[in-house]
Amino acid sequence: MGATYKNNIELTIFGESHGKAIGITIGNLPSGIQIDLDEVSRDMKRRAPGQNKMSTARKEADQVEILSGLQDGITTGAPLTGVIYNSDQHSKDYSLLKTNMRPGHSDYPAYIKYKGFNDVRGGGHFSGRITAPIVFAGNIAKQILKQKGIVVGAHILSIGNVKDERFPYNVDETLLSSLSQKQYPTIKEDVFEKMEATILKARENLDSVGGKVECVALHVPAGIGEPFFDSLESHLSSLMFSIPAVKSVSFGDGEMIDQMLGSEANDCYYYDENGDVKTSSNHNGGITGGITNGMPVSCTVTFKPTPSIAKKQKTINVETKENVELEIKGRHDPCIVQRAVVVVEAMMTLGILDMMGE
């Protein structure tokens, strides 16, 4: 089972949702970087479960114990390993799922690939729980990028049919800072009330909803990336699609850009009052030819509805070879989008830091 991303930096995740612990090892980080562990804790709390009625009732402190690579708060250059101990597992809720395949989950393909030995409790290694150590790694990367002047932020763009505003062309650090401090990061102040109603209605109906997260990175210098196979878009897409439940990734105007004419989609260059090169729009999301052009790097990530729902569904029993009905027990999110915002930020920061090492 592969669990390593390897380019200029290396990421190896480990653990299962209902195992003793989950964690990550980050290789090839620069030495001598001061890390603020309070900042790490703030991002961990943004993703943590059990904070409100719109997420799973599972409660995990998600405190990271750093085993190596950090001394007196400074990176040593050795692989940095962080571990998070699981404490609130209800494994009995999964007793039927060794043989009854959950629709929309990894159960059946994992059963085939790993010959039935995979851990299905809470999704095992396929679980969204494994994004907790990714957020830890992402915050380390976020702090390193911040020292280079690069700032990353994100917001909930939509939940179900309820939509927030998109980031403005001239998005600034003040807006990103404000969003990072909100429990429900939206640009429009009143939109999350409608999103909340959508989530709670789905839960009441024993169902779930999906949505979109929009993420930007400011002050990324021009010239980061490569054409074709090593484009920044290729690397960021690979990381974003590593987040469980992600089904679509686009950059700039993405899936809407095909409705434009070339004269509308082109981002025209100009010199500003300081002699810096800018573009008058950012339809391409700060990347052209696979390489950054100095404008904000922006992407939109789409999450499918949570597959674990309490509504009765049709499936198969792989032991009896029968068609059966399944009602999933346990504690599950009716929507993961609001908790995934910081995960998308983490992948953006890791991808940019990785490509800046080229």
Residue locations for each model-derived region?
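A short glycine/serine-rich beta->alpha loop
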Residues: 10-15, 118-130, 222-226, 282-288, ...
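Internal helix-turn-beta structural module
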Residues: 10, 306-358
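Glycine-rich anion/phosphate-binding loop at the beta-strand->alpha-helix junction
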Residues: 14-20, 206-323
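Glycine-rich, N-terminal phosphate-binding loop and its surrounding beta-alpha-beta segment
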Residues: 44-103, 107-109
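Glycine-rich, mobile lid/loop segments that gate access to catalytic sites or pores
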Residues: 113-228
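Alpha-helical support elements that line or immediately flank enzyme active sites
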Residues: 20-32, 128-150, 230-238, 295-297, ...
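N-terminal, positively charged regions that mediate nucleic acid binding
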Residues: 1-58
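Short acidic, glycine/tyrosine-flanked loop/strand segments centered on an H-E-D-like triad
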Residues: 98-124, 316-332
